[in-house]
């Protein structure tokens, strides 16, 4: 009997001790329980540029994130810089919030968002988040008015070697008298790391959202000499060879299930600047001509441009590595969700602006102004057709890497669900347990089209979208399930089954006119709704945001 009583008492004592220990541990645990969020956005980076998406460019840090997390194979952007950024941070198509054009609606390309069109920080800050921005902005209004606590706004996107024109916390930067050693990609990472260090020192009890928007590898092709040297002769085999090699890697990885698109020899830049072509000299070509037909001077010039593009991506990855190192140093890495994507596909644009181009300057230096052009842009967008500004797959397809050690158990897996930058806001809100309000200062908030991707973090499921919709500068598209309707400006509709033909090589439009009619009706219905919204809310067709020229 004594043994039984002793045993019972011991069990009760152990249970009480366990409860006491649990209570003590809960009080001793760090205050931060919600995950931190970092979204890293590249600019004009092709679908296949990163090593983890088939590229030969050295991207060990992105590759490491991919090995430890997820790669999405059918993630989309809006095909252009500013519409993608507005959609990414709001959860709406850019046209719904006055941030891109609509058919037959004058102006409005870069209008002012409606009062209810809040950015993600406005929903996170009431939940205790600190919010930081480092890099390109390209959204209407001032950054701090968008809910961010700190910001480096890279307004100077025409010279990677100068801080002139940039702003910190919405106040103009005074550049150093001697800017030797300055490089924009490094400066963005420096600011991001400074924000993280300050957060660890002064706000460790709060979670954070950090939007890191690199301007690389957007033109002008400016890179550090030591980075260019890694790739100087790497691309002399030409764009056809580069596409074949990248496509082979993509198939081995299981990233694509399609053919390789044919090079469109007669498709050049989306805008014509003939004087710029002349100024760039005899090495420049504005079509993806057969590599073997180019002169030696042209081959060398084109390969050099691609080497600079690669150097810019390489350097961006190095700086991402420094940001990751800071997360680890402050013991935030495990519970930080890192997203990486690009704002549009690689660019076929060719122009000279800002400080102009000195043909005698070393390529990639501050006095040069070079653009990648359609040849190697086609290779960077392997295996897809077209480029930035078009809504064929090459213009709108982006890598999406998602990494979160504390929350995603899958390692190195692929996710094939069609998804879009409009899905980022609802994804984050679900991850951090924040309910989006139904109204803002008494004004109803319209339902947003984005859907949370959280179910796909656990397994490869399809996230249901009624459709995915595009319109930019007359280029238009709609995806419903595996069907895609697409047309370049002034061209008839093309119809593709993306399950087997994401390369968009075999249009079924003439064989399936009823499917074209069905999808066109859906595209038009959505477009009409967005036109009605744009015309019926302030800040649209006649408003401007003061952000300057097209990017």
Give the location of each predicted region.
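N-terminal secretory signal peptides that target proteins for export/translocation
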Residues: 1-8
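Formylglycine-dependent sulfatase
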Residues: 24-489, 493, 500-521, 525-551
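Bacterial N-terminal signal peptides
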Residues: 9-23
């Amino acid at each position: 009997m004594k043994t039984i009583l002793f045993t019972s008492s011991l069990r009760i004592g152990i249970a009480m001790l366990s409860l006491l220990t649990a209570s003590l541990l809960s009080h001793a645990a760090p205050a931060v329980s919600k995950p931190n969020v970092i979204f890293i956005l590249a600019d004009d980076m092709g679908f296949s540029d990163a090593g983890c998406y088939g590229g030969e460019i050295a991207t060990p840090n992105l590759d490491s994130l991919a090995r430890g997390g997820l790669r999405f194979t059918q993630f989309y952007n809006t095909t252009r810089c500013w519409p993608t950024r507005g959609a990414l941070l709001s959860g709406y198509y850019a046209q719904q919030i006055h941030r891109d054009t609509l058919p037959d609606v004058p102006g409005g390309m870069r209008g002012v968002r409606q009062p209810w069109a809040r950015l993600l920080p406005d929903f996170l800050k009431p939940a205790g988040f600190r919010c930081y921005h480092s890099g390109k902005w390209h959204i209407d209004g001032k950054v701090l008015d968008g809910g961010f606590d700190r910001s480096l706004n890279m307004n100077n996107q025409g010279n990677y070697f100068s801080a002139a024109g940039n702003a910190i916390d919405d106040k103009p930067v005074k550049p150093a008298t001697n800017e030797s050693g300055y490089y924009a990609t490094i400066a963005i990472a420096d600011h991001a790391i400074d924000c993280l260090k300050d957060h660890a020192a002064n706000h460790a009890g709060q979670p954070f959202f950090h939007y890191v928007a690199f301007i690389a590898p957007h033109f002008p092709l400016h890179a550090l000499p030591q980075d260019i040297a890694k790739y100087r002769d790497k691309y002399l085999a030409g764009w056809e060879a580069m596409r074949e090699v990248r496509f082979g890697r993509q198939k081995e990885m299981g990233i694509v299930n399609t053919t390789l698109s044919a090079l469109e020899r007669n498709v050049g830049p989306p805008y014509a600047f003939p004087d710029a072509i002349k100024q760039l000299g005899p090495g420049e070509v504005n079509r993806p001509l057969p590599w073997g037909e180019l002169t030696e001077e042209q081959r060398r010039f084109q390969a050099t441009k691609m080497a600079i593009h690669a150097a810019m991506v390489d350097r961006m990855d190095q700086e991402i590595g420094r940001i990751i190192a800071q997360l680890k140093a402050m013991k935030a890495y495990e519970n930080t969700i890192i997203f990486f994507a690009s704002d549009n596909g690689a660019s076929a644009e060719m122009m000279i602006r800002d400080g102009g181009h000195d043909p005698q300057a070393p390529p990639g230096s501050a006095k040069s102004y070079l653009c990648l052009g359609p040849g190697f842009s086609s290779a960077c967008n392997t295996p897809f057709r077209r480029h930035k500004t078009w809504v064929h797959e090459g213009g709108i397809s982006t890598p999406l890497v998602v990494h979160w050690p504390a929350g995603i158990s899958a390692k190195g897996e692929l996710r094939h669900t069609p998804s879009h930058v409009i899905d980022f806001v609802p994804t984050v809100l679900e991850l951090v347990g924040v309910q989006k309000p139904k109204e803002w200062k008494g004004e109803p908030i319209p339902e947003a089209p984005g859907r949370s991707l959280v179910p796909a973090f656990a397994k490869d499921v399809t996230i249901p979208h009624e459709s995915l919709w595009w319109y930019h500068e007359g280029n238009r598209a709609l995806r419903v399930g595996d069907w895609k309707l697409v047309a370049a400006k002034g061209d008839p509709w093309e119809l593709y089954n993306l399950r087997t033909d994401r390369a968009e090589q075999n249009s079924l439009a003439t064989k399936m006119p009823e499917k074209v009619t069905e999808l066109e009706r859906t595209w038009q219905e959505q477009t009409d709704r967005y036109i009605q919204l744009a015309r019926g809310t302030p800040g649209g067709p006649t408003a401007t945001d003061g952000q300057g020229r097209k990017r």
